[in-house]
């Protein structure tokens, strides 16, 4: 039996360098990158790099040998090689100016088919939904791009079409659960087939080209190429699950013969689909929402897991109420407000929405409609206002969805300072810093305590205390006067029943002596009993134990150092990493608390300054009025 040589087995054979993989696949570096992105193959980090690199100490990009062997059988490899042949032949035709042959070759351009790769990477539909977050975020980003050097216009238009189709499904299924506004964009989270899908829609700013090539658009466009095929499959499956026609279509009642439809019906339909404000055509006649079947709670209580099932039932009822949160409300979006995110949210929760027809096509009613209940405005004031509606800022819609109830609109009126916009994607039971507003959401009793920390409440308490002292002084004076009147009447008429005071005093003294003798006898008996009981049982007075915080902290530090010494040498790096993470969290929490204290102090100072200025203005006005009265 031959003895195996070094690096012929084990970890050295499990990994292969990128250069060796390129030689094995006979591909260029760009084609290899494209193939790895499409197939989902990525570099690996070995446990022992020196062994994996067969004794070499330089850092190389390594892949699993099985992954490279897996790429050898991929049909796309032949298509990528055909690209190389096509480039050579078309370049030759272009050089000799054989345009007839060049036109024929361009018609036979080799295309990559990715359908089998999507089915291979996602065997089930749930697997595709789990990987939908990055897909949607990237496609929403590319849908906002203009035509660039490495991003053709057809790709951006395809991203726009697929994302609009997905948003129509979210609206029709009412599967939206959480929303949030941040610097990056608008966060949305939907629950589809029991899976939570989260994506980001960027803010609508004009595109600004970058002078430096910090982002590799070529690599990103390869991801987009795969994700467009994946989202197309997903949309097809989702639409058929709701009995919606795919591609999305409108009922024939909408396509009436008018000037817009007669000019170009396809552009009319595409604009209305992009408006997200119309119901889509269904393959079945029934358009009513499916009601949840009633569950017999008595039957559930017989089961061992009845509490868990009842909790699930309560959550389902809460989600059913959330899906109709804006039902019966009519919204109108002003020109300065971003239209698309608000239309998605309002229509996903059963509301009706419209906007100015000059902003975008698809508006259903005008601003002058008297049945509008809420108008969303993002400016300090309006020239004309209607009494029958509430003028609110856009944050009200997002906060209502996150708190799953219709909030009062007085904090969101025009020109009002908005309350903090809290993220619904954080854990309420986390150990890090929690803002006081978020604590007040979970415990409403904290709202009052937080409000009492302002200077206004302090001044109100001081004023109330002054009023109480004045009232007490008046009450004491009245009581003193009544007492003096009563004593004067008593002396004048010789007691309440006309009895002489001296006789009454002698009788009282005689009775008092008898009572005092009896009381002394009782006290003697009690003292005897107490002395007998003390002999049987004695209790010593306790002492208050004062906790020394410095000694307590020192004991904790010593215990922590002892734990650090007891850690095994192979686990010390992990222990240090955990300690660093803990220290960074504590530092971040301390910084946030300090920042919040500074903000609260600034707001208090601003309130004090406003009050002082108001008092000065009132005093000046009173002085001016008095001068006018004297004149």
From Swiss-Prot:
GO terms for biological process: maturation of 5.8S rRNA from tricistronic rRNA transcript (SSU-rRNA, 5.8S rRNA, LSU-rRNA); maturation of LSU-rRNA from tricistronic rRNA transcript (SSU-rRNA, 5.8S rRNA, LSU-rRNA). Residues 321-414 form the BRCT domain. This is Pescadillo homolog. The modification Phosphoserine is found at residues 453, 457. Residues 450-469, 489-569 are annotated as: Disordered. One of its GO terms (molecular function) is RNA binding. It comes from Drosophila mojavensis. Residues 525-536, 553-562 have a biased composition (Basic and acidic residues). CDD domains: BRCT_pescadillo_like (cd17709). Residues 454-469, 499-524 have a biased composition (Acidic residues).
